[in-house]
Design a protein with these regions (language model features):
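N-terminal acidic leader/helix
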Residues: 2-30
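Intrinsically disordered, low-complexity Ser/Thr/Pro-rich tracts
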Residues: 4-7, 52, 79
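Amphipathic alpha-helices that form helix-helix packing interfaces
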Residues: 14, 21, 40, 44-47, ...
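Amphipathic alpha-helical interaction surfaces
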Residues: 20, 24-27, 46-54, 72-75
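Amphipathic protein-protein interaction modules
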Residues: 30-63
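Short, compact, well-ordered microdomains
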Residues: 54-79
Length: 79
């Protein structure tokens, strides 16, 4: 799954990645560290905090539109 991330360059590829991620959870649940949505979301937040101060950080955080990310996550709740 992680190897697919670098090739995502369009909305369609992102949607396909989300669908693949959902399928991976269904098919390989035992490989997932986080088994609940709350654990999953908490660990995303934790990873962002840790990685943003890591020497390995290669993300340009100021270029990310966090409002859109928040909207995507919220719409998954209510749509």
């Amino acid at each position: 799954m992680i190897e697919k991330i670098s090739s995502i360059s369009s909305k369609e590829e992102f949607i396909e990645y989300l669908q693949d991620l959902a399928t991976d959870y269904t098919d390989n649940r035992d490989e997932w560290e986080n088994q609940t949505i709350s654990d999953y979301l908490e660990q995303i937040a934790s990873w962002i905090e840790d990685y943003s101060i890591s020497p390995a950080n290669d993300i340009e955080w100021e270029r990310i539109d966090f409002k859109i990310l928040a909207q995507l996550l919220y719409m998954g709740k209510i749509y």
